[in-house]
Amino acid sequence: MKKILIFIDWFTPAVKAGGPISSVENMVNLLPKEFEFYIITSTKDLNSKQNLDGVVLNKWQKVGSANVIYLEKSHLKNKILKSLVAEINPFKIYLNGIFSFKFSILPCWLFKTKYNIIIAPRGMLGSGALAVKSYRKIVFLQLMKSFSIYKNVHWHLTNDQELEDLNRVISKNITYSILPNVTKKIEFKERKKSSKILNLISICRINKIKKIEFFLRLLSEIKFECNYTIIGFVEDLNYYNSLLKISESLPSNITVEFTGQQKFSKITDYLKSAHVFISTSNNENFGHSIVESLATGLPVLISENCPWNNLEKYNAGFRLPLTHSYFKEKLIYFNEMSPRSYMGFNNGSRNYYDKFVNPSIFKKGYIKMFSE
C-alpha cells in the first residue's frame, strides 16, 4: 500500500481552523483501504497557547484512519523532519496552504527534489485572500517563483476559479487535479417551514473576509421576524466586537446569536432548525459549511465569491452579487414561501449535493491523484 505523508498546521482534535482540518480528515477517511496516510501537525489549535487534549506529543499515534504525530515547536527542525520523512519514505507528500513556513514552505523546500509534492492552496491565492496583508504575500510569492520552488509540484485545486487564480499568480505551466474537498457523511433532513419566522444560519471563522457586517446591516432593513445564528471561532476580536455593536443596534424583530465554536454534532442540530444558510464571504474556495448545509437539505444564499454555481437551476438556493438589494429580495422570497415550495428547495438542496459534491463521485479522482 502506497504511503501518503500530509503536512498541516492543525489537525483534529483541533477545530478552530475549520475547513482545511475537515478536508484532510475526510479525505483520509475516504481512502483507508487505498493508501496508508501519515500526518505531521502541530500540538495546538489555531491561536491557542495550550496543547491539544488527549494527544501524545512527538510520537506517532492512530487517529481515525491516519497515523499522526503532533510535533512541539522544538521538534519542528530540519533534522527531525528529514528523519521522519526518511522513516516513512512516502510515495507522495501533500502540503496544505501556501504561507505556512513550517508546514508548507519548509517541507516543499526540503523534499521537492526527492519526493513527489502535491500542494492544496486552500483558497489562499484568491484575490480576496491576497488582499489581506497583500504586500507581504506578493513579495513572498515573487521570491518563491524566482527560486522555482513550485516547479514540478502537482496542485490539488477544488474548482475552476482556483485554477484561474493559480495561473494568474503562480504560472500557467502547471500540472493539477480539480477535485472538490471531501465532506463528512451527512443525513438528509426533511424540513417544514410553516411559521413566519425565518431562521438563518452562518458557520464560519469570525474574520473580515467573511463580510458578516454586510449581512448584519442588511438585517436592519428586514421587517419580518428573523433569527440569525452565527457559529464559529472568533479569529479577529476587534472585528467581532464591531459585529456585536451592529447586532445590538438592530430592531426588535431581528435576533442575532454568536455561539462560538461548536462540535460537529452540535452544528448539525443547529442546521436542522434553520431555514436558510448564509455566506457573504469575500473569498471562498470551497466552503465546507455550504456543502454540509446542502447535504442536510438546507438551501443556501451565498455570495458570488463562493464557488457553487447553478443553485437556482436545481432549487438549492441562490448565488448572488454582494449587494443588499439582491440578498434582501431573496430573504423576503424565502420568508413568504409556501410550505410546499420550501419543500422543493429542501429536496433540491440534497439533490444538488448528490449530483455535484457527494464524495463517492470523486473517489476515483483522489485515487488517481495519489497513485500517479
Positions of the model-derived regions?
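Conserved donor-binding/catalytic core segment of Leloir-type glycosyltransferases
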Residues: 5-7, 156, 183, 191-210, ...
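N-terminal subdomain of nucleotide-sugar transferases
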Residues: 1-55
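Glycosyltransferase donor-sugar binding loop
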Residues: 42-46, 203, 227-244, 258-261
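Short alpha-helical donor nucleotide-sugar binding micro-motif in glycosyltransferases
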Residues: 261-262, 269-274
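Membrane-proximal helix-turn-helix segments that form the acceptor-binding/catalytic region
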Residues: 137-155
